[in-house]
Design a protein with these regions (language model features):
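Pyridoxal 5′-phosphate
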Residues: 1-259
């Protein structure tokens, strides 16, 4: 069975399921129009759902269960996989959001996001310190070919020292710019991009059953563990990306220890 993760793709692109024919497709309505949080969906072929078997069950997913007889019957179809009470107060917002996207047109959204993202990338990679060194390092393509609206970077001072992404997130928030810092649910990509080795990280999982994030940072000698992410989407405007570039330009010739 094939699962297509379209959560990041679908909000700004038309997904052609006649060309790609997976068994399952997951979507996030929050990523599409920003509200409501915590609601997504799994599109599934009927024959694929019939092959699924659950090792446990929760409320709302069974037709009958017995403790004495130690048995249960799973609700047929998709309902057998919807644990608990669905968010019936938030679901009407999904219908309104989909109608809003339909009224604009996904192609229009795609073109707009592509233009804003392309301009943002061009401006960020062009930033230079007086000595010619780049202010930011961009992860991923330097153009919009095969790229969505997510722009991930790290900032560097004139001496090439990386400025911690958590500090950058804090400063951006103070400037009323919403950025996210971290590994963004993709630790493997983070480790490759930042050059962490197996030996660097294996020590973090020795000797202790658990470790706080602060203890983790101490174990890797305070190295930056992520990057700074800006997401361009349906609600983004040119004023948004322009404000980010203006903010980024304030780090030209700015030493890391001053941040």
């Amino acid at each position: 069975d094939v699962l297509l993760d379209a959560a990041a793709f679908a909000p700004t692109n038309r997904l052609d399921l006649s060309q790609w024919q997976p068994d399952f497709v997951d979507l996030s309505f929050y990523k599409m129009f920003g509200y409501p949080t915590g609601i997504g969906c799994l599109l599934a072929r009927k024959r694929a759902v019939q092959r699924l078997r659950r090792p446990w069950y929760a409320g709302g997913t069974i037709t009958f269960s017995s403790v004495v007889a130690e048995g249960h019957y799973l609700t047929p179809g998709a309902a057998g996989f919807e644990d608990g009470t669905v968010n019936y107060l938030g679901l009407p917002a999904v219908e309104l959001g989909l109608k809003h996207i339909e009224s604009i047109g996904i192609e229009t959204i795609h073109t707009r996001v592509q233009c804003l993202t392309g301009w943002l990338i061009d401006q960020l990679v062009a930033l230079r310190h007086s000595n010619g060194r780049p202010v930011v390092q961009l992860y991923g393509p330097v153009n919009t070919y095969r790229r969505g609206g997510t722009v991930q970077v790290n900032f560097f001072d004139p001496d090439g020292r990386m400025i911690d992404c958590l500090d950058m997130e804090r400063l951006a928030n103070e400037a009323r710019i919403s950025l996210r810092a971290g590994c963004h649910c993709n630790p493997g990509a983070r480790e490759v991009a930042l050059g962490f080795t197996r030996d660097d990280l294996a020590a973090c999982f020795r000797d202790q059953e658990s470790r706080t994030f602060e203890q983790f940072l101490q174990k890797i000698d305070g190295k930056t563990t992520g990057a700074l992410r800006a997401s361009v989407g349906l609600a983004s405007t040119f004023a948004d990306v322009y404000a980010y570039v203006q903010f980024a330009s304030t780090f030209i010739d700015r030493p890391a220890h001053v941040v």
